């Protein structure tokens, strides 16, 4: 082999090694489910603005965001480890790190515990003990109650399991105030009632996947029209709950207007999906992902309104 050939071979090997390291790092990041973290933090930070009635200290926001991200990431890692058997069989999840054997279950467990410990330390030391305790409770609930107890046993898995995703609203409030009140409880409830429509829309799209691994999501065991009906019921309760923040927290006029408009748009989309599902099981007709994406946009904009309301009220 010529010198040029040797150099080319070495270069290719070096690129492969770099790609391998990059793949492993990306796999560890993927285990934390970054999109879920983004959504959780999108509820945390606006609540901090609302609790402060202005702009909270930057260091406090950073500590809460980092601690919250590590906590949510830790819970997701444990979820991936426990669910690796069904993740291997589902189209939506088979490209995750554990099904692809890029990361071993033992290494993932260590990673999850490290993230969880770091999260607790950060929140306890730089935020406050109450926020740290709520974070630990959310993590434990998601892993022990939802992942290990409910997910594979009941159609109500995501209804009650979704409680874990509501905790960031409480943590954002306690990070600023150091205590709880009815205000964050209302926002907690908004996320609670938002979770079933959001998740059932996604589960309807991937119902064959869930059926193949015997996870009894509602769209697996019920016809699409019943899923649509349940989505509409939860959506109405969610919108009504979101409007409770006005009298409970004494918001300015901006929030109820924004919540009303966003709620009306979301309800329209929920009713449309229900109407499309009444006479067919065809996903191309029902288009559940329209509601899924609408739900993401709804929650994001609603909590932006939560953050903006005290700023606009002056």
From Swiss-Prot:
The EC number of this protein is: 2.5.1.141
**Chief place of localization:** membrane
Q: Name one GO cellular component term.
A: plasma membrane
Localization, per the record, is: Cell membrane
What superkingdom does the record give? Answer: Bacteria
**Keyword ATP-binding part of the UniProt annotation:** no
- In which family does this protein belong, per the annotation? Belongs to the UbiA prenyltransferase family. Protoheme IX farnesyltransferase subfamily.
The further comment given in this record reads:
Carbon 2 of the heme B porphyrin ring is defined according to the Fischer nomenclature.
According to UniProt, the name of this protein is Protoheme IX farnesyltransferase
Q: Which organism is it from?
A: Nocardioides sp. (strain ATCC BAA-499 / JS614)
